[in-house]
Amino acid sequence: MFDLNQSLFLRALRRQPVERTPIWIMRQAGRYLPEYRKVREHAGDFLNLCKNPELACEVTLQPLRRYALDAAILFSDILTIPDAMGLGLYFAEGEGPCFTNPLQDTKAIHTLKIPSIPESLSYVFDAARLIRQEMPKELPLIGFSGSPWTLACYMVEGGSSRDFKRILNLIYTEKEAAHLLLNKLAVSVTAYLIEQIKAGVNAVMIFDTWGGVLTPQNYKDFSLAYMHQIVQQLKKEYPDIPVILFTKNGGQWLEWMAETGCDALGVDWTCDLASARKRVGGKVALQGNLDPAVLLTTKNCIRREVGSVLASYGYGTGHIFNLGHGITPDVPPENVAIMIEAVHEISPQYHL
């Protein structure tokens, strides 16, 4: 039987020698694929797709059939936890995620219940079990969650936001309530990731999409502290499951992030990979960081930019190739193939 620990992805995460740089793509199951759009249409809407384990399994497997990727990522949404807490998640056309019951005041935070994760999010774990059963045995499956801070942003703002005025007001004027909310979310995220691991995921990633809007001190207090808490709990129960942290626009805080005990850091395209490696490469693996906009260009440009990312990281293991954020819906699928082929062709020279 194939030992998943021998997969390129898990070896690179643990900074063990690899023959070439592994690659997967944030949002690799997504709207850029015509086959995904067909399944989503059949599901009726995005949330139905997330809540149907068979359909979630199908869209998770689609990019693996099309491309030689080194990992799959569970198809779900970061806002499943707030939905399970009773906030009423829905997706408005052209607006992204919204809540019918956002947290309007501190009373709502105090009365917010921590849900029973195994029951309320069973559809996620059913999907994970099904995917693990159906996907290639030699490929790892990545589970994920939003960070407590990022979930809190959506829950207090009521959806996406340009300026995050409400949540920032909360952390400045109602610190105690903010910490209460973040602690409830940290407990929920920990339970959520543990259930995903029990269902068969081989690594987990925490997406801190909005950590980069904070001041350095507020990042430490309101985002990093809670991710640290989650990593410590996960490592206590599952020391061998790698944990990846990703704070978008958080390149200035890599040293702090590396102190959490995580195994890898995601870096976005605004961060220089060579200097990131100098700063934290002795402690953690690095994942990233091609600018997603490159996939809208030409074959020559894609190959050149892939080469630049690989050269920037340099020789040796500890690098997982990825985009600096999620792939956009307008990317031609053939350009993804060009990127993957380029990683396969160019990266072996860095692993001699």
Curated annotation (Swiss-Prot):
GO biological process: protoporphyrinogen IX biosynthetic process from glutamate
Top EC class for this record: lyase
Catalytic activity: uroporphyrinogen III + 4 H(+) = coproporphyrinogen III + 4 CO2
UniProt subcellular location: Cytoplasm
CDD domains xrefs: URO-D (cd00717)
Similarity remark: Belongs to the uroporphyrinogen decarboxylase family.
PANTHER family referenced in this protein's UniProt entry, alphabetically: METHYLTETRAHYDROFOLATE:HOMOCYSTEINE METHYLTRANSFERASE RELATED, UROPORPHYRINOGEN DECARBOXYLASE
Known partners and oligomeric status: Homodimer.
UniProt name for this protein: Uroporphyrinogen decarboxylase
Native source organism of the sequence: Legionella pneumophila (strain Corby)
Lineage: Bacteria, Pseudomonadati, Pseudomonadota, Gammaproteobacteria, Legionellales
